[in-house]
Swiss-Prot record:
Membrane-spanning parts: none
Positions with biased composition (Low complexity): 145-155
Annotated knockout phenotype: Adaxially rolling and erect leaves which leads to plants with erect architecture and reduced lamina joint angle. Abnormal bulliform cell number, size and arrangement in leaf blades. Dark-green leaves with increased levels of chlorophylls. Reduced number of tillers, altered grain morphology, and reduced number of grains per main panicle. Reduced number and length of adventitious roots.
Basic and acidic residues: bias regions: 201-210, 255-264
Name assigned to this protein: Protein ROLLING AND ERECT LEAF 2
Gene: REL2
Originating species: Oryza sativa subsp. japonica
Lineage of origin: Eukaryota, Viridiplantae, Streptophyta, Embryophyta, Tracheophyta
Subcellular location per the Swiss-Prot or TrEMBL entry: Cell membrane
Tissues in which the UniProt entry reports expression: Highly expressed in young leaves and panicles. Expressed at low levels in roots.
InterPro entries given in the database record: DUF630, DUF632
Biased composition (Pro residues): 81-90, 110-126
Chief subcellular location: membrane
Length: 767
């Protein structure tokens, strides 16, 4: 029997199924360890931030030098979707365009754009955010005098349109786009708008002849503030009068002939274009800028002069922190953001307790109390301790869970159960086949020898029975294998792709936050210690110890995260590679495997190779070196505290001896200053005299006090030197260790993003 069992284990099919079971078992265990390591890594980021903040708060004297250059942070806004470039408007169309939208009022005007540079490129439109509560208006600058040769005349002509809280726009007549989107009445109003524009042009010409411009088309409530508005317009847009040459040079001849002054006087306006006309969303176009340096792409030279390309805006902020505590506070904020970036992966890996409890919804909990029977689907406990708690499987919850979709962990658990079942079935099938071969040999021997026919019939009956068992076991193995293939292709494949994309998103966000931290932390190179005499306290030492423990945990969890992720993908790849073979090895691979299985195997192979190529050793060494740096600081603080304690001990001893000497002097000499003088009544003829007594009984005690005082002074000198060494060591180690750690972790996260980006491109074929 043992020989038969060993022979079954040596079969290729059985060995392959055993390897599949082992790989899936490793994948399930690695997934659990990866979820735990991922949760611990996110937790260690928060703990490191808190410990670093407590450490920095204990060193308020570490200030940033005034000679240190500030940090320039560039935060790119989300890129806007490219908008299609419409064809340039024809002359007839431009002459019958609808009126432009109203602009912002004077009290909520956006700051004017900077003056154009010396280049001859047209300036980009400046987007502003409209207020809540209704449309706004803004007066454009007064027209220039006719004596200006380089610029055509301008007017403060206004036209009303509807403004929304999210966006507002004014027409840029040099590069005109139709409104977005035109309503059904657009073409009906074209003729009326053209007539209105001609009438207003005639009125403006009459007013220009009188030397001033009066806005006839404004509402009555706006006429009261015309004088104040005009004064503010001159202050707000006065710097634009020098740019008329530049603005006039960008106007095409067709626009100048058809629109005339209407195109020129709208050049001062602010434009925010929509999807059809290029309107940017208000949250991107009018983001608050402490130091506003917005950059837009130049106008496209490949298209017509009326087509523009607006790129995603970038916000640059110049940051200067004053102390180490402020630097660490800024770093702590991005530590928290980096930890929050991993929540999506935690959901997929089921790393939180809430997700673990969610998997037990199919269990109905019954709590037995002394006075009542409470039945609830939730796991909420009552205030009284129960007598007994029993769980029962709820089939309705199982059906609901199957309809909602399985989690990644449950998918792997079911695959492991299927693999165990498949291994037993294949093993049983192969053992039946071996027994069948033995019976065939026996039958052949009996027929050859011509023995008793009864034995021959029994052997044939056994062979028929074994053949039936072979068919049944083969069908069972085929059914189980088909179930595994179905779960692999329909559930596991999309879950792995989703996990890969979630990891890419997490590391991309972490890389962004670590890059900002790396920029901010460069300021520690300019730290100076304004108080070198400040000694270390117990709170400082505890904060340093907590920082060392937190960074050490970060280092350990970082290594665990990378290790278990590699183990997980390696186990999955090994299992997927074996699933490409049919349970029955006689069938060729191409006839069995599907396209999605081959693509999924290739996808996991590239994922495994990308993880193997990651330079995690450099990042791990950088974090470990910072742990060593903090440990050195902690050691120096311990030495300083030891010297301080010894100094305090000697000081107490000196104080004790001094007090004892003063007590003796007070008792026997009745004075603190009679030491070394004669005793009372020792003079001749009973005359009191104070002569020096060479036989001072307290000379020995005074000598001891002098020696103790010298010890105290020596220890105080050592303590002062130890304080200076500790402060200097702390400053130097922070300046060298902290930037190196953030530089390494930022570089590693960037490498992970590049590697996973290549892997995710391969995921398209898996989907």
């Amino acid at each position: 029997m043992g020989c038969t069992a060993s022979k079954v284990e040596q079969e290729d099919t059985v060995r392959r199924c055993k390897e599949r079971r082992r790989h899936m078992k490793e994948a399930v265990a690695s997934r659990q360890q990866l979820a735990s390591a991922h949760a611990d890594y996110l937790r260690s980021l928060r703990l490191t931030a808190a410990a670093l903040s407590r450490f920095a708060q204990g060193h308020p004297s570490l200030a940033v030098s005034h000679h240190t250059a500030p940090v320039l942070l560039t935060t790119a806004a989300p890129a806007l979707a490219p908008t299609p470039t419409p064809p340039p408007p024809s002359s007839t169309a431009s002459s019958s365009l609808p009126p432009p939208t109203p602009l912002l009022p004077k009290h909520q005007q956006a700051p004017p754009p900077p003056p154009p540079t010396q280049s001859h490129q047209p300036p980009p439109p400046v987007a502003v955010r409209a207020p809540r509560g209704g449309p706004r208006r803004l007066k454009v600058p007064h027209i220039l005098s006719d004596s200006s040769v380089a610029s055509p005349a301008r007017s403060s002509f206004r036209k009303p349109v509807v403004g929304t809280p999210s966006s507002s726009s004014a027409w840029d007549w040099e590069n005109f786009y139709p409104p977005s989107p035109p309503d059904s009445e657009f073409f009906d109003r074209r003729k009326a708008d053209l007539e209105e524009a001609n009438r207003l042009r005639e009125l403006e010409e009459e007013e220009k002849a009188r030397g001033y411009l009066h806005p006839h088309h404004l509402k009555e409530e706006d006429e009261v503030d015309d004088d104040d508005d005009e004064r503010e317009e001159e202050m707000h847009c006065g710097g634009w009068e020098d740019d008329d040459d530049h603005y006039a040079s960008t106007t095409t001849s067709e626009t100048r002939s058809e629109e005339g002054e209407m195109g020129n006087r709208s050049e001062c306006g602010f434009a925010a274009r929509s999807e059809y006309g290029g309107t940017a969303p208000s949250e991107y176009a009018a983001a608050p800028l402490p130091l506003p340096l917005r950059r837009r792409d130049e106008r496209s030279e490949a298209g017509d002069s009326s087509s523009t390309v607006t790129a995603a805006a970038e916000m640059r902020m110049v940051i200067r922190h004053r102390t180490l505590a402020e630097i660490v506070a800024a770093i702590e904020e991005y530590f928290v953001k980096a930890a929050e970036a991993g929540n999506g992966v935690s959901e997929l890996l089921e790393a939180s307790r809430a997700q673990l409890d969610r998997n037990f919804r199919q269990l109905k909990k019954t709590v037995y109390h002394s006075n009542s029977l409470l039945s609830s689907l939730s796991s909420t406990w009552t205030s009284k301790p129960p007598l007994a708690v029993r769980y029962k499987l709820d089939t309705n919850a199982l059906e609901m869970e199957s309809m909602e979709g399985k989690s990644h962990g449950s998918t792997l658990e079911r695959l492991l159960a299927w693999e165990k079942k498949l291994y037993q079935e294949v093993k049983a099938r192969e053992s039946v086949k071996i027994e069948h071969e033995k019976k065939l040999s026996t039958l052949q021997s009996l027929e050859y020898r011509g023995r008793d026919s009864t034995k021959l019939d029994k052997t044939k009956a056994s062979i028929n029975k074994l053949q039936s068992l072979i068919i049944v076991t083969s069908q069972a193995a085929t059914t189980t294998s088909s179930a595994i293939v179905r779960v692999r292709d329909n559930e596991l494949a999309p879950q792995l792709v989703e996990l890969c994309f979630a990891l890419l998103s997490m590391w991309r966000s972490m890389n962004h936050f670590h890059e900002i931290q790396n920029e901010i932390v460069q300021q520690v190179r300019g730290l100076v210690d304004n108080s070198m005499a400040e000694s270390t306290s117990d709170l400082h030492r505890l904060a340093t110890r907590d920082l060392e423990a937190a960074v050490s945990a970060w280092h350990s969890n970082f290594n665990r995260l990378i290790k278990y992720q590699r183990d997980y993908i390696r186990a999955l790849y090994g299992w997927l590679k074996l699933t490409l073979f049919q349970v029955d090895s006689n069938i060729p691979q191409e006839a069995y495997t599907s396209l999605i299985s081959r693509e999924l195997t290739t996808f996991c192979d590239e994922w495994k190779q990308a993880l193997d190529r990651l330079p995690d050793a450099s990042a791990s060494e950088a974090i470990k070196s910072f742990v060593n740096v903090v440990h050195v600081i902690y050691t120096k603080q311990a030495e300083e505290m030891k010297i301080k304690k010894r100094t305090e001990t000697y000081s107490k001893e000196l104080e004790k001896k001094t007090n004892s000497l003063r007590a003796i002097e007070k008792k026997y000499y009745q004075s603190y200053s009679m030491v070394g003088l004669g005793l009372p009544g020792s003079g001749r003829d009973g005359i009191e005299s104070h002569s020096f007594d060479a036989r001072d009984p307290l000379a020995e005690k005074k000598t001891e006090i002098a020696q103790c005082r010298r010890k105290v002074e020596d220890e105080m000198t050592r303590h002062a030197k130890a304080v200076e060494v500790t402060r200097s060591m702390t400053l130097n180690n922070i300046q060298t260790g902290l930037p190196g750690m953030f530089q390494a972790i930022a570089g590693f996260s960037g490498t992970v993003v590049e590697a996973l980006d290549v892997v995710c491109r391969r995921a398209g074929s898996v989907r």
